Amino acid sequence: MVICGMEKPYIVDQKFEKESTLAMGEYEHCIFKNCQFESEDFKNFQFVDCTFESCNLSLVKLSGASLQKVHFKDCKMQGLRFEACNPFLFEVSFDTCVLNLSSFYQIKGKKTKFAGCSLHEVDFTEADFSEAVFDDCDLAGALFDQTNVSKADFRSAFNFVIHPSINQIKKAKFSPDGLAGLLQGFGITIG
């Protein structure tokens, strides 16, 4: 259903396949599959309860975009600046996505789920990812600085370096294999 009026269009329960452009609007309960949105401008778009599957969203401009309960699966999403999004009801989840070089600076991402994701050099500075799950995620070069990851689950994550002295990690879960990533900042050699 598409409702048009004086404001931007309101699109509900639609499926978009192999699209390369998207009209600015409010999208609710929509599915985007195999779309090529690389470098598109999603300024002030609104996505509520939407799913992006096998899409290329690299370098998409997110200024003022609203992402509310949006799930990304098998998507390429390099270089995104999530801090440019509207923070109101921001909620996202990621399943086997490539988010390399993206930024979550100061994002409130409590309970966010990352599963099987590549998070190389992602910036989590001053963000709140408490109770987040990093399941089988590669965090090589990811930056955690003044980040709240208390109660987060890193048990199957790898290649991370999180300095306990500058981040909140109380009750976070780590595997014995991940302990080196917590001690690296102290100049300690393990093994």
Residue locations for each model-derived region?
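Tandem repeat scaffolds
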Residues: V2-G191
